[in-house]
């Protein structure tokens, strides 16, 4: 017998969070495999998964229908399907309405909302399926018919239960009474039946119970999957299956019909986007080139403006320009980066600070006709003032037309294990022990080993189920959050383009699509990003201006300062933007930067792309004159001249494709995109053949062509654009110059911009002290909230360094202290600044009351007395007989410093243990630098950082600190696994190993690790670990 045609019209994906158990792509592929005529994705009050489903259906040639399931507050469950573009806009607006009136994650829908969306009736151009409950009311059906005449149905959902026949008969009678036709739907929650255990776990998690406690809340069987048409034909009358095709035929909308329109109010009356962009670009050129615009720049500007006009992107550039102008008007440091720095127009407008004409950067890396996608401009703002910029956008365009893009939070290994374990009834102690035992680099195949280490048999059925479900959950959407700064701004109501909902943060809204969805749909996104170093540099410059009496801006920093480069050549770069990592510090003495372009290369070279493409060593050897630079052809040599014949940047690969293999600039950009995705998706093969053929046609050696292809593959998704590296290099140089010439201001700026960077405040302070900076502890009599320079140039730490102390209390203290006479004692401080017991206790613990009460114990006593006096005598000062308490020991003070401040200005903890350590032949970090290559040696230090880069083939790099500085430890994979507990769990780590010395770069290669944390007693320190 022939199988009936069928279209699934009620289907949830895992974007119905904690309900659906399959990805949209899985559903589309399965629907095709089952021979379905169409598939509707109808996630609950959401269109978050529709772009993924649309792309998958398009790839498979499957008809895709956009819809959503929603329930009114009085329990009416409806599925809406969009017929056309207008219907889609109405559905999107309805979802927005329901979401915006509820807290994040929820929605509230009333029946009359269906009529409020459009003046022309209830949700025009949408079809409605009513999913009745167990005791449906004919009144609900009659209401539906009256509001949606000719476009409403009763959804019949049969799941092979004993009551199916009775339910079908009841719904047929209901349909006759109400005048509603019936249609078969599946209430699909998974693409295959095997996902049922995952769906059960999701249900239990949603209900905050275990699978065993969930009971009847779980589905009775696994029928809510995309069933075969044979199976459906045995459950449903033929006419109900045929009706699915009639409904699907009425749903003609495709997501490809969406068209984005740029905002227009940034364009003055009487101007067009093209004329205004040209006018502002001309103004910018006069500012950038006061001595006259070079002919090459003028030619480049005309080329860019022509391509921008052809692609109709003028309004996009002007929108970003307007945002940057606002930031500059408010003295907010900002700087464009990424591929936007390839644009001379962006440089003229002041959006970016890198002159692309000087570096011959390719505009097609940014805007390409062949790519046909809107450009993507990333702008970094001071992280503490970015909210001002965000609120400017909301104020200018309104929350109806501006919203942040979503970011999709998915399950990772630890979260998947934790949630699966909870739902399956494992104990919290077991779950915590397991997740705590995992390192960030543990692979899936290592999980059974971790289970076994905790005494759990990985082959026991219950544990196997835990592992299997956790594995299935990895990569599952958990919830939507807001993107770090990607804004979507539209000309009309944004809600008719994509649903908008409230963000967790007040005064913010977020769309239901993430950046990948936006890229796929060609919607404009402006990235308003936060960069801590911009905040730090602005603070540093402000302090320098205050101390010198001359206001200073970034453009006032002298260019090409030899002392700054000399400092970087010695890897003295702690706290310096982008070159403070272990890998960068190891590279600096080898590369020895002498000018700004060297910094551009430095930023790009220590990246997975050049490392995996085997470009680092050839570059360094050729730079140092130890390897000959191969001459290929004049055109090729010109592209690679500045990088010694080695392609370091994405733009160079694109230029090589153009000059060596006859690619067009647009084709070269397509090559770049294929490079970025080939490890995940493949797709480089056609480009390889074209490269080989093109280079052969130009008589270039095949060996050179093969080497370039191998390097392209090495680049993978990690190749660095020169434009991006140049933008970052500006901040590298500025921060390095400030560290070299104004180290105290540099330290203040970093401390006042935390959290940021690789290093903790403790390490930054230790480094500054090694550079001669005097650092003073927090003091309630002299400290502000922020750290600052005193009249002698010393850094006075701010009250922000005291853990748990509030900025409000600090501001009250500084306000009272400045307006009136200094505080007399702790009771006077409490009374005049309105401090509570907790405030005083925190100040005493942070040793910030020393000027008023003496050492910590005395201060804690004074705080207690002040509170008692305030309670008994209503704040009236009372003379209290002084009680002399013994001062804490050095060790007790160290413990208290780290507990309260996370740092100490007293002796380093290891200086107190040095004699004990020396007796056991543990040498200092300074001693390591004096020893020779291959020396067998032992050292010890407080663990301040662990890193395991993806390019390091399993090697873990550990940074240890002692009283003389930092030491770098290399732990190879075999030792990582053998001594993972010591590696991951030690606060004080002893290392027996062998020195590896290359010039100024010294590494201790570990042979054995020893956990010596017990020697620190109660001292609490924190390591900063990075993937």
From Swiss-Prot:
Source superkingdom: Bacteria
Record has Iron as a keyword: no
Enzyme Commission number: 2.7.7.7
Keywords noted in UniProt: Cytoplasm, DNA damage, DNA repair, DNA replication, DNA-directed DNA polymerase, Nucleotidyltransferase, Transferase
GO-annotated cellular components: cytoplasm
Keyword Hydrolase: no
GO molecular function, one term: DNA-directed DNA polymerase activity
Example GO biological process: DNA repair
Transmembrane segments: none
Subcellular locations according to the entry: Cytoplasm
Matches recorded under InterPro entries: DNA_pol3_alpha_NTPase_dom, DNA_pol3_finger, DnaE2, DnaE2/DnaE/PolC, DNAPol_HHH, PHP_dom, Pol/His_phosphatase_N, Pol/histidinol_Pase-like
Catalytic activity, as annotated: DNA(n) + a 2'-deoxyribonucleoside 5'-triphosphate = DNA(n+1) + diphosphate
Pfam families to which the protein is assigned, alphabetical: DNA_pol3_alpha, DNA_pol3_finger, HHH_6, PHP
Main subcellular location: cytoplasm
Enzyme category, top tier: transferase
Function in brief: DNA polymerase involved in damage-induced mutagenesis and translesion synthesis (TLS). It is not the major replicative DNA polymerase.
Family of the protein in this entry: Belongs to the DNA polymerase type-C family. DnaE2 subfamily.
NCBIfam families in the cross-refs: polc, PRK05672.1
PANTHER family (UniProt xref): DNA POLYMERASE III SUBUNIT ALPHA (PTHR32294), ERROR-PRONE DNA POLYMERASE (PTHR32294:SF4)
Protein name: Error-prone DNA polymerase
Annotated source species: Dechloromonas aromatica (strain RCB)
Lineage: Bacteria, Pseudomonadati, Pseudomonadota, Betaproteobacteria, Rhodocyclales
């Amino acid at each position: 017998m022939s199988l009936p045609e069928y279209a699934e019209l009620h289907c949830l994906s895992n974007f119905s969070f904690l309900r659906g158990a399959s990805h949209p792509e899985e559903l589309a592929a399965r629907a095709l495999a089952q021979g379905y005529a169409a598939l509707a994705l109808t996630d609950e009050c959401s269109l978050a998964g529709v772009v993924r489903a649309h792309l998958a259906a398009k790839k498979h040639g499957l008809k895709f229908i956009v819809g959503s399931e929603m329930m009114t507050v009085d329990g009416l469950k409806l599925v809406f399907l969009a017929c056309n573009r207008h219907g889609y806009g109405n559905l999107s607006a309805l979802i927005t309405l329901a979401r915006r009136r509820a807290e994040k994650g929820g929605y509230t829908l009333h029946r009359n909302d269906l009529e409020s969306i459009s003046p022309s009736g209830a949700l025009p151009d949408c079809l409605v399926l009513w999913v009745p409950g167990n005791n449906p009311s004919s009144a609900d059906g009659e209401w539906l018919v009256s509001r949606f005449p000719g476009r409403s149905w009763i959804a019949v959902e049969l799941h092979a239960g004993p009551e199916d026949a009775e339910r079908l008969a009841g719904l047929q009678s209901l349909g006759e009474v109400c005048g509603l036709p019936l249609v078969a739907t599946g209430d699909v929650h998974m693409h295959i039946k095997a996902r049922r255990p995952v769906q059960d776990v999701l249900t239990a998690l949603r209900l905050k119970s275990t699978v065993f406690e969930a009971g009847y809340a779980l589905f009775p069987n696994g029928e809510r999957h995309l069933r075969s048409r044979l199976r459906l034909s045995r459950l449903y009358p033929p006419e109900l299956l045929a009706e699915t095709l009639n409904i699907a035929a009425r749903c003609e909308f495709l997501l490809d019909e969406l068209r984005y329109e740029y905002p227009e109010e940034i364009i003055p009356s009487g101007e067009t986007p093209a004329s205004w962009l040209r006018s502002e670009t001309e103004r910018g050129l006069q500012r950038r080139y006061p001595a006259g615009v070079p002919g090459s720049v003028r030619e480049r500007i005309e080329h860019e403006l022509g391509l921008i006009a052809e692609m109709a992107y003028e309004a996009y550039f002007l929108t970003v320009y307007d945002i940057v102008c606002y930031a500059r008007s408010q003295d907010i440091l900002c700087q464009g980066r990424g591929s936007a720095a390839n644009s001379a127009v962006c440089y003229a407008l002041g959006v970016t600070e890198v002159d692309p004409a000087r570096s011959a950067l390719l505009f097609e890396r940014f805007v390409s006709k062949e790519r046909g996608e809107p450009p993507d401009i990333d702008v970094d703002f001071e992280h503490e003032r970015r909210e001002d910029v965000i609120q400017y956008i909301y104020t200018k365009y309104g929350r109806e037309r501006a919203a942040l893009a979503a970011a999709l939070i998915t399950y990772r290994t630890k979260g998947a294990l934790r949630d699966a374990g909870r739902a399956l009834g494992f104990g919290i102690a077991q779950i915590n022990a397991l997740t705590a035992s995992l390192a960030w680099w543990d692979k899936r195949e290592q999980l059974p080993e971790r289970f076994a280490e905790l005494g759990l048999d990985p082959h026991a059925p219950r544990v196997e189920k835990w592992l299997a479900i956790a594995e299935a959950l990895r990569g599952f959407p958990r919830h939507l959050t807001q993107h770090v700064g990607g804004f979507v701004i539209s000309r009309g109501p944004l809600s008719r383009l994509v649903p908008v909902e409230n963000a967790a943060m007040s005064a913010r809204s977020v769309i239901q699509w993430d950046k990948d969805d936006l890229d796929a749909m060609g919607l404009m996104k402006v990235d308003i990003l936060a960069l801590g170093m911009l905040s730090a540099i602005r603070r540093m410059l402000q302090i320098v201006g205050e101390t010198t009496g001359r206001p200073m801006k970034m453009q006032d920093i002298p260019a090409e300062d030899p002392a700054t480069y000399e400092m970087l050549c010695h890897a003295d770069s702690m706290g310096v933007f982008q070159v403070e990592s272990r890998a960068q510090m190891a590279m600096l003495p080898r590369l020895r930067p002498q000018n700004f372009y060297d910094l551009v290369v430095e930023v790009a070279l220590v990246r997975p792309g050049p490392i995996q493409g085997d470009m680092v060593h050839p570059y360094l050897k050729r730079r140092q004159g130890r390897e000959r630079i191969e001459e290929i052809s004049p055109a090729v040599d010109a592209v690679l001249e500045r990088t010694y014949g080695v392609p370091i940047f994405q733009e160079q690969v694109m230029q090589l494709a153009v000059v060596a293999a006859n690619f067009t600039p647009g084709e070269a950009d397509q090559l770049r995109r294929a490079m970025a995705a080939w490890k995940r998706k493949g797709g480089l093969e056609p480009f390889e053949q074209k490269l080989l053929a093109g280079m052969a046609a130009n008589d270039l050696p095949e060996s050179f062509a093969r080497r370039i292809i191998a390097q392209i593959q090495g680049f993978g998704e990690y190749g660095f654009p020169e434009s991006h590296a140049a933008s970052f290099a500006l901040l590298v140089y500025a921060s390095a110059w400030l560290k070299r010439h104004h180290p105290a201001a540099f330290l203040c700026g970093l401390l006042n911009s935390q959290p940021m960077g690789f290093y903790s405040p403790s390490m930054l302070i230790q480094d500054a002290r090694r550079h001669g900076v005097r650092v003073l502890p927090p003091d309630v009599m002299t400290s502000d909230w922020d750290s600052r320079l005193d009249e002698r140039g010393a850094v006075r730490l701010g009250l922000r360094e005291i853990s748990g102390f509030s900025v409000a209390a600090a501001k009250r203290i500084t306000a009272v202290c400045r307006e009136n006479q200094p505080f007399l004692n702790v009771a006077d401080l409490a009374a005049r600044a309105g401090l509570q017991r907790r405030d005083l206790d925190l100040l005493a613990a942070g040793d910030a009351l020393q000027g008023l009460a003496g050492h910590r114990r005395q201060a804690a006593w004074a705080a207690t007395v002040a509170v008692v006096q305030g309670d008994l005598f209503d704040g009236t000062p009372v003379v209290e007989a002084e009680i002399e308490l013994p001062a804490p020991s050095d060790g007790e003070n160290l413990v208290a410093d780290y507990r309260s401040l996370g740092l100490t200005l007293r002796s380093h903890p290891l200086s107190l243990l040095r004699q004990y350590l020396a007796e056991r032949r543990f040498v200092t970090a300074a001693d390591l630098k004096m020893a020779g290559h291959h020396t067998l040696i032992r050292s010890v230090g407080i663990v301040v950082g662990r890193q395991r880069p993806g390019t390091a083939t399993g090697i873990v790099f550990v940074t240890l600190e002692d009283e003389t500085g930092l030491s770098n430890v290399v732990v190879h994979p075999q030792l990582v696994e053998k001594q993972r507990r010591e590696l991951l769990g030690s606060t004080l780590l002893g290392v027996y190993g062998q020195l590896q010395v290359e010039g100024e770069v010294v590494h201790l290669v570990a042979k054995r690790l020893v956990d010596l944390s017990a020697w620190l007693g109660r001292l609490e320190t924190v390591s900063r670990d990075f993937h």
